[in-house]
Amino acid sequence: MVEQDFICSDSFESSGIVEWNSPSNIALVKYWGKKHNQIPQNPSISFTLSKCYTNTVVEFKPKKNTQNEIHFTFDGKENSDFEKKVNTFVKSIDKYSGFLKNHDLYINSKNNFPHSSGIASSASSMSALASCLVDIESQITSNDNNFNLRKKSFISRLGSGSASRSIEGPVTLWGKTDAYKESSDLYLSLIHISEPTRLRS
C-alpha cells in the first residue's frame, strides 16, 4: 500500500463517543532517526506491553464555528502543552480523515502507568488517539479490519514514529526490509511467531 491509499476526503456530520486502549511498546531493535514525513532510517522491531496502556476517549460533535475546535485533557485535567501537540497532530492529518474539518473533538487521555516511569507514553497515547479517529471514520467507509489496522498505524506514525508499532502486537516490525516481505515504512507489520523461542545459556 502507498500513501494515497490512506487519503479519505469523504466527510459527514455526526456525534458520538469512541474509546480505545493502546499499549506502549519496547524496542528490541531501535530505529536511528527518521527521514522526511516520519519515514524511518532503518527497520525496528518491538514487543507491545499489554499491561501498560493509554486509555483515550474522544467525543465528536458537528463544529459550532467556522473553524473546528480540539479540546484535550489529560487524566481529566487541562494540559496546555499536550493540547498544543494534539492540535498540531490532528490538523496535520486532516487530508487523510476528511471528517475532522467538520467536527469539534473533546479528547481525554490517561495512562495506567506513571507518566515519567521510562515507558514510552507518546507511543501509546498517539496510537490510542489515531485508533479512535479511524474508528470514527469507519462509520462512513467499508474498509476491512486489516486496512483499518494499517491506517491506524499509518496515522499513529505521523504523530510519533514508535506509535506505529503500538496498534497491535505482540511483536511488530516498522520499516521496509528485504528480510520480511510484508514490511513497510508507512505502517507496522505483525511478526507471527508460531511458538515461543527459548533462549539457551
Regions found by a protein language model. Give the residues of each.
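Short linear Ser/Thr-Pro motifs
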Residues: S44-S46, S121-S122, S160, S201
